[in-house]
Amino acid sequence: MRVSEPSDVVIRSDDTCHIHLTWSGSECDKYPAKQHARKVAMKLGVSSGLIYLVGQPTVNWGDSDQPQPFRQRRYFYYLSGIDEPDCYLTYDIQADLLTLYVPDFDLRRAVWMGPTLTIEEAHKQSDVDRVNFFAALQHDLEWWTTKNKGTRPIYVLHDSQQPLIPSKRLWLDNERLLPAMNAARVIKDEYELRMIRQANYISGLAHRKILEDIHRMSTEAEIESSFLATCVSHGAKNQSYAIIAGSGENAAVLHYVKNNEPLDGRQLVCLDAGAEWRCYASDVTRTIPLWTDWPSERARNIYRVVEEMQEECIRRIRKGVRFRDLQLLAHDIAIKGLQKLDILTNDCTSAIYESGASAVFFPHGLGHHVGLEVHDVSKRPITALDGNQANWGNHNFVPLLTDSSWSVPLLDEGMVVTIEPGIYFNRLALLNAQNQPLAKYINFDEAEKYIPIGGVRIEDDILVTAKGYENLTTAPKGEEMLEIIRRGIDNS
């Protein structure tokens, strides 16, 4: 039986494709989808097969005719650069052909909601080879599978995203694509770094605006709304994650997002907020005094300990460094700082660390990758804790590190990681710690005096470079932060 050829989708093996790209003007902002597709194929280590990805579909809320806010699937975006719903993508590895499928034109939808993405618009946004309407997808997939007679696999991320092809000879591989894409995404290219820099730039503006106006604010909600307003006014309508604006004891809740309490009588506010730019994240945390200066000596002292933790860890970032070593360094500095404040006993720092006592005050990891996700993917966890990673936050607060943890992934050029140490005085955590063996290392009477402070966290996004690092975060901190607060009061 003669097999009909597809509508403009896959180059036959006996054809030759010549692609010539001229970069000029706004074309420099085209998403490098083709480069990413080739990178994923290289990580797969194969010379043939078809990568098949499904974009985020339009989905309504349960029992409602109202759509949920759209958020593109990040793996799909990595190979397409298209931030529109109901799209599909194929990449023929042997033919080196990347094809995007956009929704068919729907007049009724166009009248009510505006037209969907056109073929011309898609080509302007991304350097995909071809763009077709969705109506061609099924035919093109069947053509490809029939031509290859089940001798080459179709790579999918999940079983739920496999193509609906009526073929008994279909070879699906749902195991290899995800780790290959994770390995590709962990190293950022120049386009991605521009997006992350812009996200950080807008976040920096929003953090600075809050410092200028903090003396006028009376609630956590005002801080959140100010941050959002600055981001939206600069074109960043989406946040990388829910804004955390925790004042007082709320600053000791790592992912506090209620942001609905008054600031009156509070010493500090922990503001963890980062804008998103073209699907790329920023992740920025600043701890802000609600006074013209530090409201108490205790608040100042804790800030200085966390500041030292961050500065020393950032200073050591370079290609080839084990991130886990920075995690250990941060704990070592935290332990010594808390010993000086008589919060921890003067026992050996290694004994205190191994007991888990320092994790009562610093219960989370030092950082993570940043990219299309705020907690971006990688081939292996950055601290190599793997399945034990959850133990940083277990009820005993004991960081269970096995011998295998020493086989740690190294930092490499092009990675973007956060450095976000923190020290917290969480009432529930301290109460729980009193019943643990680690209690002998903690002076609870002294620690409880710090509960009104809540906690201090400082977080920057750091690019690993060939010779060291570049701090991508522009939000003020330390003495610069205090100067802006003072000027805001003087100018009011």
Curated annotation (Swiss-Prot):
Its cofactor is Mn(2+). Keywords: Aminopeptidase, Hydrolase, Manganese, Metal-binding, Metalloprotease, Protease. Mn(2+) 2 binds at residues 272, 283, 459. It catalyses: Release of any N-terminal amino acid, including proline, that is linked to proline, even from a dipeptide or tripeptide. One of its GO terms (biological process) is proteolysis. GO terms for molecular function: manganese ion binding; metalloaminopeptidase activity. Pfam families: AMP_N, Peptidase_M24. Binds 2 manganese ions per subunit. Gene3D superfamilies: Creatinase/methionine aminopeptidase superfamily, Creatinase/prolidase N-terminal domain. SUPFAM superfamilies: Creatinase/aminopeptidase (SSF55920), Creatinase/prolidase N-terminal domain (SSF53092). Its EC number is 3.4.11.9. Mn(2+) 1 binds at residues 283, 420, 459. Signal peptide: none annotated. InterPro entries: Aminopep_P_N (IPR007865), Creatin/AminoP/Spt16_N (IPR029149), Creatinase/aminopeptidase-like (IPR036005), Pept_M24 (IPR000994), Peptidase_M24B_aminopep-P_CS (IPR001131), X-Pro_dipept-like (IPR052433). PANTHER family: XAA-PRO AMINOPEPTIDASE 3, XAA-PRO AMINOPEPTIDASE AN0832-RELATED. Catalyzes the removal of a penultimate prolyl residue from the N-termini of peptides. Belongs to the peptidase M24B family. This is Probable Xaa-Pro aminopeptidase AO090005001240.
